[in-house]
Amino acid sequence: MLFRSVPRIARDPWNLDRTPGGSSGGASAAVAAGMGPLAIGTDGGGSIRIPASLAGIYGIKPTYGLVPIYPFSAAWGLSHIGPMTRTVADAALMLNAAAGPDARDPFSLPGPRVDYVKALRGGVKGLRVAWTADLGFAKVVDPEVKAACERAARRFRELGCRVEEIAPKWPSPQAAWKTMFLGGIAARLGPALRDRRDDIDPGLAAIADETRSWSPTQFVQAWFDRLAWEEHPRRLFERHDLLLTPTIACAAFKVGLDGPGEIAGTPTGIYDWIPFTYPFNMTGHPGASVPCGFTRDKLPIGLQILGRRFEDATVLRASTAFEKIAPWAHLRPPV
């Protein structure tokens, strides 16, 4: 939201002093609290998967263009629309309704239409699964989060998958993503920053101010850097069917903050706690967050399941297979 029209902030139903994440945090909190069975999220850097992880629900960012976007968001080229639900089956049902081409979105994907509910019936035996706790560039991951996700990754062996821990040496794409993402927000604000600055969220106004000194060449270079970085997951998916990571590097932190400030004693910047989400907004791969455990403070932890582009059905199938051996829908927050 660009303007400060909402007087209250969303809180995590598992602990009202903690954040449900964003930017679809209100959606995740509502679903987790039982206010409704499903919600739509928009994800330009993790805004489906982050709040799904923090609130202990399921969320999937589909392949870029599978669900059309109109009108375009500030994060065009990065933004995906997808379901946030208590169960994988509900997410598949939502995708059946939402996926498909739209003439108003030139990036929306054509058919053929896929029945994602039907796709849940297949198994995952024989799938080649890669697991990494850092992608090669995560600054720090909370030990409880890492341990829970590692246990969850190992459980895919029970499903008949071939699980391999990998140690990629990928460079961080944060600078390119930040340029594209923040530049889009600044451009979208446009005249409003001049005419209604007092009504604009201070954080967004600060973002717009920061980007004013950036040159057009920086923005174009970010797109080239994006294309270059896409080679890393492309090569990985030549050898593996799925990639597993923590959804984010920590559990829910204090409400009202932009980040935890530190993780396991290591100081963190504003984007250091989401190193696993925004890279795949740049590549367009489908990615889901599945609940996979809790911290000692009873805060949810999410495992991210990523697949090849256009193979959303495989991500959903893996998600429902994990859900069957590690169910979560019966777990309810204390609200």
Q: Where do the PLM segments sit?
A:
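Short glycine/serine-rich loop segments
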Residues: M1-D102, N281-G302
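Short, surface-exposed loop/helix-turn segments at secondary-structure junctions
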Residues: A10, F107-G111, G184, Q221, ...
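Short, Asp-centered acidic motifs that coordinate Mg2+ and/or phosphate
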Residues: P37-L38, D241-L243
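A short helix-breaking turn/cap at a secondary-structure junction
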Residues: K61-A147, R151-A152, W170, I325-V335
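Acyltransferase
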Residues: K118, V141-A167, L189-D195, F219, ...
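Short helix-loop capping/hinge segments that flank enzyme active sites or metal/cofactor-binding pockets
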Residues: K118-A133, M180-R234, P246, C250, ...
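Small-aliphatic-rich amphipathic alpha-helix that forms the alpha element of a beta-alpha
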Residues: H232-R235, G265-P291
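A short, well-structured catalytic beta-strand-centered motif of the EAL phosphodiesterase domain
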Residues: L303-R309
